[in-house]
Amino acid sequence: MHNFEEELTCPICYSIFEDPRVLPCSHTFCRNCLENVLQASGNFYIWRPLRIPLKCPNCRSIIEIASTGIESLPVNFALRAIIEKYQQEDHPDVVTCPEHYRQPLNVYCLLDKKLVCGHCLTIGQHHGHPIDDLQSAYLKEKDTPQKLLKQLTDTHWTDITRLIEKLEEQKCHSEKIVQGDKEVVLQYFKELIDTLEQKKKYFLAALCDVGKMINQEYTPQIQGMKEIREQQLELMTITTSLQDESPLKFLEKIDEVRQRVQMLKQRPLPEVQPVEIYPRVSNVLKEEWSRIEIGRIKKAVIPEMRVSSKRTPCSWSDNDEKEMELFKILNIAIVSLISVILMLILLFNHHIITFLNEITSICFSEVFLSVYQSLSKNLYDLNNTVCYTLYLLKEFMWKIVSR
């Protein structure tokens, strides 16, 4: 605390003097502080009711004051003037209490370990706490920074520094791992997308080839039928015009027209048979590719698609009762045998292929997958061939029986 400020502080409340009063012993105190001391003493002489004894809080001498109490003590006008002038000036080097206006922090509270003002000790939250003056408190705590500095430089903090370095190193290592994984993910899906794009191109190219096959299958037939149609229309025009010709020209042309019509009618017509595309891409994608593991897509085989004439199905839809009865009588043994063979083929083709589809997605390697797809195609061709052969055999036997 500033020396000059200390002279303006009440020794009882440790605040700047308020209404300072002078005792006969020349010591000065706040009026309120003296009233509190007087009330606390309770010393009254019965035989001298006009005088009230008071012990000076500073020198401990007994003095007597008038019965009017502390108001009878003279005011220390000189000190009050100095205080008023002091309070009007700015003192940046003096720290004041944030809770009590213009009261200096001139006392150290031992309980709360902080600076307080006189008001904090008398009417504030530090009332009744043990206190010490600033100089004594400073001397007691003067060596504390060295002790704290020693604590802050021991091995504990060295371990913390090492721990920070280790954590930073682990963080950097983990971030590198994450970054590496990101690059792996990007590369993996890039290769996967490239593979899928390549497979898509292969599928589309195969379908384009199938389209060319279909065009080669139907275009010549359609063109031939269009030529026949054009010749028909031409002959119709010629035939119509002959009716207006003279008998001579009519007879000259009619035989030629007749021969052309007969030749046109005798011209063989192609047998219209629907073609079948095998395998169907939708079935391949649904039944085979949907079960392929992602890691095997790159080695997955694109099936060879073909276009072939659709065979007569292995079924009979003849509603003629006599024909069916005769056929049953003459061919009961053969039909029974054929039925058994047909059931075995169809059963094998349905269940075994389904089973192979399931096994393929789980444990088949790329080589077995290719073999499986080839086997599936061959089974399909075998099924169609057998059905068509049975159909021809049935037609042949029916012709023999009919004769």
Swiss-Prot record:
It is a single-pass membrane protein. A zinc finger (RING-type) spans 10-60. It catalyses: S-ubiquitinyl-[E2 ubiquitin-conjugating enzyme]-L-cysteine + [acceptor protein]-L-lysine = [E2 ubiquitin-conjugating enzyme]-L-cysteine + N(6)-ubiquitinyl-[acceptor protein]-L-lysine. SUPFAM superfamilies: B-box zinc-binding domain, RING/U-box. E3 ubiquitin ligase involved in different processes such as development and immune response. Serves as a negative regulator for innate immune signaling pathways by suppressing RLR-induced activation of IRF3/7 and NF-kappa-B via interaction with adapter ECSIT. Regulates autophagy through modulating both the transcription and the ubiquitination of BECN1. On the one hand, regulates the transcription of BECN1 through negatively modulating the NF-kappa-B pathway. Residues 163-246 form a coiled coil. It comes from Mus musculus. The chain crosses the membrane at residues 329-349. It holds the Pfam family zf-B_box. PANTHER family: OUTER SEGMENT 5 (PTHR24098), TRIPARTITE MOTIF-CONTAINING PROTEIN 59 (PTHR24098:SF14). Belongs to the TRIM/RBCC family. One of its GO terms (biological process) is innate immune response. Pathway: Protein modification; protein ubiquitination. It is found in: Endoplasmic reticulum membrane. Moderately expressed in the spleen, brain and heart and very highly expressed in the testis. One of its GO terms (cellular component) is endoplasmic reticulum membrane. This is Tripartite motif-containing protein 59.
